Each structure stands twice: as C-alpha cells, then as structure tokens.
C-alpha cells in the first residue's frame, strides 16, 4: 500500500498543501512507488518561517531544563517507534534493516537524548577576565537535510537547535521524507509549543531557496551536495545569514607498509561500502604501498564478494540497493568513466548483481591502478566504488591524499 502524506507541519498543526502537485518516493529495493508527499510552495515555506519567528521569543526564554525535557520525550518516542522507522528508512534509502535500526534510528534517538542533557549542562554565561560571555540562541534556523542518513541528519540539526532555544523550519530530502513525517508526528504528540518546529517538504530550488532567502531566517544549516551548498551560501550571503554547510567528500585511506594488510584492507572496504557507499565520509580512495599492491588487490576482490547486496528487508548482506534510479545511473556512469580513463576494473562493474535486476542495485566495485588525475579519484561517486592508488614513498602517499578538491 502506498503511503500518502498531503500536509505540512506549520505552527503546531498539520496544514493541507495548497498545490495539488506531489512528489513520488520509490522503494529502493524494487523501484516501486512507496509514498507520495506534497510539493511545497514558496508561500508555504514563508508561512513556516513566520510561525517559527513568532514562536522564537517564548521558546528562547524557556529554561534549558524544560527544553531538555521535551527533547528527552522525543527521544523516547523515537525509541518506541524504532522498528517502524527502521523499516521505513530501509525502504526509502536501502540500508539493510538490521543496520537501519542501529544506525538510521539508533543514532537519531541518541542525538535527542544527548542534546537534552547538553541543554541542562551547557554553560550559557561565564566570566572571562573582565568580560562576561553570554551565549544566546541564533534565532530561526532553516534545516535542509539529505537523504543518505535522513533521520540522523535531521536529528543532529533539530535537536541541537531546539536545545539552544532556536526555532526550526525543516525541509527534509524529498527522496527519503517519510521518516521526517513520523518525527513531526512525534513532535506533535509530545506537545512542543506551536511554531517551535515546522516542516515543509518540496524541491530545493523552491522550498529550500525560499527558506534561505526569507528575511526572518537567522541561520541556515545545510547538508548535501557541494553544488547545492554553493547555492545556499550565495543566497544566504545576500542577507548575511549565518550558514553551516556539510558537503561532499572524497576521503583517502592511507595504508602503510608495515600495516596488518588483511585487517586494514577489510576495515577500509567496510568504511567505503557502508550504506552502499552513500556516505560523505566514505573512504573511497585506498592509498597503498606499490610493493603490496598485488596482495591488496587479492584481498579487495575476496572482501568485495562478501558485500554483494541483497534485499534490504529480507536479505542478510551488509549493503542493499542505492537510493534511486538516478543514483544508480550516476554510479554506473562513473564506473564506465573509470574504465574509459584506463583504470583497471578488478571486480564489480555496471551489470546488476544476479537476481537483483529490479530495484537500484550495483555490484560492489573495485578499480586498481588509479591515478589522481582520473575522474573516479577526484569526484564523489556516492556508491560502492573503491579506487586503489599505489604509492612508493610515504611523502607521495600524503601528496595523493591531499590531491583533492575536498
């Protein structure tokens, strides 16, 4: 059965969307329709900011202890609904169910409980020499979040902002939004004051840009692509807003000559393939001694076989499908680019895993003999693709690691 959500959470209540336009959410494991959500408008984004601005004075004047109590109740409700949330995120994102419960739900639950504690313990005012430092909430925060760890990224932003005394307008990713609706249901259930938390779904160029541009938005916290982050910063600069950006990555994993190679390679590959490589801090560049390259390659091929994806709900693999058809094609294009530029494909490739032709699956893929000037060594792929780059000296290894736009 398709999940249908047709309202936004604004000023403490569910408000029916004005536009009939909707956005489809697909099941990553099958490609089938999973849910539909409303496509928000500029007017609805503005209404959410106005509600947050109206609620700010009262909320910022509540005691940190009281704010912490709200956060703790939210944490408890998330824990109560952990099975439901894990299933939702496994369907939306494709992370296997067991990992989804521990990571995609466990970490958000912890984020709210930890910020509840911090709110009560935080030093809001202190004397330093002849000066008094007073820490005050920033104001209305626009939180714009990605799809790869959807509820966790939401929770990190929302919990911290609420603990600080800020009010929030959330725009979750339209690719994986149902978990955000459940969080809004929980926030409504615990009785958070009206306007303190608001949520509008929709497209970034419409809802996201409206939130960033609104004169009553005081701060923007954005996690997503570098391209979108540049756009957020440019719009926010027009009104000199505070901006926090967490963008892309192409992290290097240097393995030294005297390392325990089997252990280091296996650990590095898990940190590359976690969440099917859809992690901004994934260790996607393995920089290894040239003298041990052949050994590393053999271990990488054998280890990759243990990461062959399976259905995120019923399977037992450590990885599942990619989030969408768009992401699947993007990863395939990068694999083809690696082949075209002369990297040596030692396992994986663009062919779907056997028996997983439906859904958005890609084989775990390893390239060796990769040079730093190759596209796959420079650009964020966001899929289960590892580049092995050999080095001759430790100085060269460091230079390789630093040869990145990130």
Language-model segments: residues:
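Rossmann-like NAD(P) dinucleotide-binding subdomain of oxidoreductase/dehydrogenase enzymes
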Residues: 124-263, 391
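Conserved glycine-rich beta-strand-loop-beta hairpin in the small C-terminal domain of fold type I
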Residues: 359-362, 379-385, 404-406
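Generic non-transmembrane alpha-helical segments
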Residues: 73-77, 81-84, 182, 186-192, ...
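ALDH superfamily catalytic-core signature
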Residues: 219, 227-371, 393-395, 399-400
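Long amphipathic alpha-helix in the N-terminal Rossmann-like dinucleotide-binding domain
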Residues: 49-50, 69-83, 95-122
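Residue-level signal for inorganic ion chemistry
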Residues: 31, 67, 89, 112, ...
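Short acidic active-site motifs
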Residues: 44, 206-207, 396
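Short, structured beta/alpha segment
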Residues: 1-91, 262, 339, 391
């Amino acid at each position: 059965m398709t999940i249908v959500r047709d309202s936004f959470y604004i000023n403490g209540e569910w408000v029916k969307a004005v536009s009939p336009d909707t956005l489809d959410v697909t099941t990553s494991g099958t490609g089938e329709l999973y849910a539909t959500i409303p496509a928000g408008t500029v007017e609805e984004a503005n209404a959410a900011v106005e509600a947050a601005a109206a609620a700010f004075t009262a909320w910022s004047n509540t005691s940190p202890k009281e704010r912490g109590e709200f956060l703790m109740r939210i944490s408890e409700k998330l824990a109560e609904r952990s099975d439901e949330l894990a299933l939702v995120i496994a369907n939306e994102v494709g992370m296997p169910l067991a990992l989804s419960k521990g990571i995609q739900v466990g970490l958000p639950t912890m984020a709210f409980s930890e910020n509840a504690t911090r709110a009560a313990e935080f030093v809001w005012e202190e004397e330093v020499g002849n000066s008094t430092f007073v820490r005050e909430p920033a104001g209305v925060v626009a939180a714009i979040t990605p799809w790869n760890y959807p509820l966790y990224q939401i929770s990190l932003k929302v919990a911290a902002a609420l603990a600080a005394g800020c009010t929030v307008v959330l725009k979750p990713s339209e690719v994986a939004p149902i978990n955000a609706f459940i969080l809004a249901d929980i926030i409504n259930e615990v009785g958070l004051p009206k306007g303190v938390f608001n949520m509008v779904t929709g497209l970034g160029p419409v809802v996201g840009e409206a939130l960033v541009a609104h004169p009553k938005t005081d701060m923007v916290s954005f996690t997503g692509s570098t391209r979108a982050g540049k756009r957020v910063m440019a719009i926010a600069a027009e009104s000199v807003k505070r901006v926090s950006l967490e963008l892309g990555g192409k992290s290097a994993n240097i393995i030294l000559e005297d390392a325990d190679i089997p252990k280091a390679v296996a650990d590095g590959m898990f940190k590359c393939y976690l969440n099917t490589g859809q992690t901004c801090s994934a260790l996607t560049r393995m920089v290894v001694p040239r003298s041990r390259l052949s050994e590393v390659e053999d271990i990488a091929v054998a280890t990759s076989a243990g990461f062959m994806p399976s259905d995120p709900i019923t399977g037992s693999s450590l990885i599942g499908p990619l989030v969408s058809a768009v992401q699947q094609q993007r990863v395939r294009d990068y694999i083809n680019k690696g082949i075209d530029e002369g990297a040596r494909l030692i396992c994986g490739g663009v062919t779907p895993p056997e028996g997983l032709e439906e859904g958005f699956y890609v084989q775990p893929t390893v390239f060796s003999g990769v040079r730093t000037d190759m596209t796959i060594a420079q650009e964020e792929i966001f899929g289960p693709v590892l580049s092995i780059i050999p080095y001759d000296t430790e100085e060269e290894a460091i230079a390789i690691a630093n040869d990145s736009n990130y």
